């Protein structure tokens, strides 16, 4: 083989080796950095742009795609200890002609975290309303989507600000009062009774606890490498004290059943999506909501746990699209009558 050709392969091999070695080093030494790069990459790939908006001295961080049009904008509220990027797996399957807005909930990721902030569900609803007003998102009624804690906030928001919301999608929402507690809730009550807030299952501080949380929240058993588990923990640990404070606030007497107390005030067309194998919030909550909300459609997903957005993103996106189409067509037909 010609020496120049050999040199070419050596140079090419060396050039390729640099990014490969950088990736391996990141994976082994800085897995949390790799996770941040992953989200950045997916936002860029899906056309989601990150922006900031302020209400007085309070900062909201959000991502968006598209512009307001004749179809309702979609505002998406994430769950406890998550962030706006949790919706990316669903965004992937949503049409690009929809105006999407995913906001970091109060105290999460790029949104202001203040020791003076009211973290109750009512407090969060007021903050989200401030965000909506800042963006003038309620210039025309929008479609509101929320999951878990975000679902609780979304439901209460629709009850408090009915003129803002054209339709509602609640994905396994928190905030309902069950006749009997499931194993997860029983465990939480035991921890509250013993004041062992360090052991809340939804606030992991080791890779092992992170793995347990993933098993609790999902029916699908994801095989997550140890380094990625470590990275997920590393990203969360600096925020765990805040998560504990928030958790104690949303399970307090003031907030615990706030969706239950307001569900009969929800008047907009509503879609409920719930995983049948949810171990965190029992699927019977869907029936409770359906009995209290007049115009309500329930979708129960087989072989799916609490992390509906992570486990069934394509199905979730399709259900949202189909529901929006049915509501939109009904509204158009009413205008023609």
Swiss-Prot record:
It is a single-pass type II membrane protein. Its EC number is 3.1.1.23. The keyword Lipid metabolism applies. The active site is at 148 (nucleophile), 278 (charge relay system), 306 (charge relay system). Residues 72-313 form the AB hydrolase-1 domain. Optimum pH is 7.2-9 with 2-arachidonoyglycerol as substrate. Residues 30-337 are cytoplasmic. GO terms for cellular component: AMPA glutamate receptor complex; GABA-ergic synapse; glutamatergic synapse; late endosome membrane; lysosomal membrane; membrane; mitochondrial membrane; plasma membrane. Pfam families: Abhydrolase_1 (PF00561). Changing residue 204 to L: Loss of bis(monoacylglycero)phosphate (BMP) hydrolase activity. It catalyses: Hydrolyzes glycerol monoesters of long-chain fatty acids; 1-octanoylglycerol + H2O = octanoate + glycerol + H(+); 1-decanoylglycerol + H2O = decanoate + glycerol + H(+); 1-dodecanoylglycerol + H2O = dodecanoate + glycerol + H(+). Changing residue 148 to C: Loss of bis(monoacylglycero)phosphate (BMP) hydrolase activity. One of its GO terms (molecular function) is monoacylglycerol lipase activity. Keywords: Endosome, Hydrolase, Lipid metabolism, Lysosome, Membrane, Mitochondrion, Signal-anchor, Transmembrane, Transmembrane helix. Residues 1-8 are extracellular. The keyword Lipid metabolism applies. (9Z)-octadecenoate binds at residues 80, 149, 306. Its main location: membrane. The chain crosses the membrane at residues 9-29. One of its GO terms (biological process) is negative regulation of cell migration. It is found in: Late endosome membrane; Lysosome membrane; Mitochondrion membrane. InterPro entries: AB_hydrolase_1 (IPR000073), AB_hydrolase_fold (IPR029058), AB_hydrolase_sf (IPR050266), Epox_hydrolase-like (IPR000639). Belongs to the AB hydrolase superfamily. Lipase that preferentially hydrolysis medium-chain saturated monoacylglycerols including 2-arachidonoylglycerol. Through 2-arachidonoylglycerol degradation may regulate endocannabinoid signaling pathways. Also has a lysophosphatidyl lipase activity with a preference for lysophosphatidylglycerol among other lysophospholipids. Also able to degrade bis(monoacylglycero)phosphate (BMP) and constitutes the major enzyme for BMP catabolism. This is Monoacylglycerol lipase ABHD6. It comes from Homo sapiens.
